[in-house]
């Protein structure tokens, strides 16, 4: 009899629904939990796999294929594919329409085309060539001016166009009447010509201009004071009489003027030369009057003439120290009741400045004198160098034997070099702090960096230990 195994209720109600199968337990790794989304637990789909492969293939470079295409080539290909026929711009279309449509004479007179600088220059050169080729043509109908660069921008009937540097070709015409007719033909509505022989001071009024142009000499205060000043200033003033405040006329134009002629210029030159020749005699008379002392004395000028130069005086003082008497300082604190300069000084009582030879003799006497103070040596930081006695004491405290004088000299030079180096370091600290002086805090900081000062050793203890009483600074009293 075959035995049948029946599941008991206990076996059917096992804990498998709580623990889960083995395949389900594989999903629970230490980095994942039950609460992760199901999309992360799924396997990679074919679509996702293809996308990843495409991205990796783009990132990976194929070594056997030469990459000749650039982004610019791609843009060029796209533009050719999109726009097969070139589309004209609106500016080009308008210019092409203007070229094809014929213009009448009235339209040409109304619109004056703006020329570029190159075209204007070519027009200028063509005008010069025409004038040189046809000298015998009628000059009454010819245009005497040359077209300037700014001709299309303003009205051509302006007087300033005729007095540009290129427009001075009018000076070739000597006759003033012919030049007047030509100017009236070229400039409409001109009441008085610029080169008429009526008057040198006249008003040129143009109908189209808002501001009239005055043809006048210099201002009143400059013309009235022509006799004053130096001969050069008077000569410049006479020349400036024939210059307008707006433009300057050349001498070739002014030759036609009755007020400006060769005789007048010659007379002016002769008067100028006579005035220049009178200058030495005037100077001699001034010197004679100065000697006679007829002028009022100027104390500042006399003091400037008779005083030493400040720089030379400082150099002499730095070289030697003069011996002073005690009698000079007796009346130093008394008040000065009388003025410094009462009256002009006489020639006999004037200060006599010694010569260089006298100064050299005085300096040599002072150098040879036995009463000469010993010079003190100073370091770069403007403090006294340690004296040799202090260096000798320090050296004897460290050594048990006697020290020779040559060793002391070497020690002094070494101490000087040490102080120079420290002065450079301290000046760097002061510059960093934007100060011009070296303070005690800079020294303390430097000694801290050199491990000379610590919490156990202070600066005052080092001063008491190494510095003598003559060098050590006085103790600060605490209040």
From Swiss-Prot:
Biased composition (Basic residues): 45-63
Coiled coil: none
Recorded GO CC terms: CENP-T-W-S-X complex; chromosome, centromeric region; condensed chromosome, centromeric region; inner kinetochore; kinetochore; nucleus
Keywords: Chromosome, Nucleus
Residue ranges of the region described as Disordered: 24-65, 82-143, 250-277
Compartment(s) where it occurs, according to its Swiss-Prot or TrEMBL record: Nucleus; Chromosome
Any GO BP annotation: chromosome segregation
InterPro entries: CENP-T, CENP-T/H4_C, Histone-fold
Compositional bias of kind Low complexity: 259-277
Polar residues composition-biased segments: 30-44, 102-116, 130-143
GO molecular function, one term: chromatin-protein adaptor activity
Pfam families to which the protein is assigned, alphabetical: CENP-T_C
Primary localisation category: nucleus
Record's function text: Component of the kinetochore, a multiprotein complex that assembles on centromeric DNA and attaches chromosomes to spindle microtubules, mediating chromosome segregation and sister chromatid segregation during meiosis and mitosis. Component of the inner kinetochore constitutive centromere-associated network (CCAN), which serves as a structural platform for outer kinetochore assembly. Modulates outer kinetochore KMN network activity by regulating interactions within the network.
Known partners and oligomeric status: Component of the inner kinetochore constitutive centromere-associated network (CCAN) (also known as central kinetochore Sim4 complex in fission yeast), which is composed of at least cnl2, cnp3, cnp20, fta1, fta2, fta3, fta4, fta6, fta7, mal2, mhf1, mhf2, mis6, mis15, mis17, sim4 and wip1.
Family (UniProt): Belongs to the CENP-T/CNN1 family.
Name used for this protein in its record: Inner kinetochore subunit cnp20
Phylogenetic lineage: Eukaryota, Fungi, Dikarya, Ascomycota, Taphrinomycotina
């Amino acid at each position: 009899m075959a035995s049948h195994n029946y599941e008991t209720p206990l076996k059917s109600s096992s804990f498998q629904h709580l623990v889960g199968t083995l395949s389900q337990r594989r999903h629970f790794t230490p980095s994942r939990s039950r609460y992760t989304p199901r999309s992360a637990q799924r396997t990679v789909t074919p679509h996702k796999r293809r996308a990843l492969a495409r991205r990796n293939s783009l990132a990976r470079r194929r070594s056997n294929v030469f990459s000749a295409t650039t982004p610019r080539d791609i843009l060029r290909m796209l533009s050719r594919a999109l726009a097969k026929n070139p589309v004209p711009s609106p500016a080009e279309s308008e210019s092409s329409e203007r070229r094809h449509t014929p213009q009448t004479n009235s339209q040409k007179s109304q619109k004056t085309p703006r020329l570029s600088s190159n075209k204007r220059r070519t027009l200028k050169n063509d005008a010069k060539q025409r004038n040189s080729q046809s000298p015998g043509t009628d000059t009454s109908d010819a245009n005497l001016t040359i077209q300037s660069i700014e001709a299309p921008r303003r009205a051509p009937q302006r007087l300033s166009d005729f007095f540009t540097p290129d427009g001075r070709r009018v000076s070739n015409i000597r006759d003033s009447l012919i030049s007047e007719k030509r100017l009236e033909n070229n400039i409409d509505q001109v009441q008085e010509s610029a080169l008429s022989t009526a008057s040198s001071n006249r008003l040129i009024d143009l109908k189209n201009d808002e501001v009239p142009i005055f043809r006048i000499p210099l201002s009143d205060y400059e013309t009235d004071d022509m006799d004053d000043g130096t001969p050069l200033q008077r000569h410049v003033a006479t020349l400036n009489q024939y210059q307008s405040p707006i433009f300057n006329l050349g001498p070739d134009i002014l030759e036609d003027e009755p007020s400006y002629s060769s005789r007048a210029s010659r007379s002016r030159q002769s008067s100028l030369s006579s005035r220049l020749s009178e200058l030495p005699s005037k100077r001699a008379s001034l010197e004679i009057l100065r000697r006679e002392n007829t002028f009022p004395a100027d104390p500042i000028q006399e003091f400037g003439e008779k005083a030493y130069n400040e720089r030379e005086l400082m150099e002499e003082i730095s070289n030697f120290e003069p011996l002073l008497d005690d009698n000079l300082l007796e009346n130093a604190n008394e008040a000065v009741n009388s003025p410094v300069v009462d009256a002009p000084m006489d020639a006999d009582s004037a200060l006599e400045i010694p010569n260089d030879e006298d100064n050299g003799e005085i300096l040599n006497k002072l150098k040879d004198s036995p009463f000469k103070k010993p010079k003190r040596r100073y370091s770069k930081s403007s403090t006294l160098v340690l004296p040799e006695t202090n260096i000798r004491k320090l050296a004897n405290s460290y050594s048990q034997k006697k020290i020779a004088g040559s060793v002391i000299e070497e020690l002094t030079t070494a101490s000087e070099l040490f102080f120079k180096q420290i002065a450079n370091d301290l000046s760097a600290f002061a510059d960093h702090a934007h100060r011009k002086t070296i303070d005690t805090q800079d020294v303390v900081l430097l000694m801290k960096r050199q491990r000379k000062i610590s919490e156990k050793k202070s600066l005052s203890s080092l001063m008491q230990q190494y510095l003598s009483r003559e060098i050590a600074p006085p103790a600060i009293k605490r209040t």
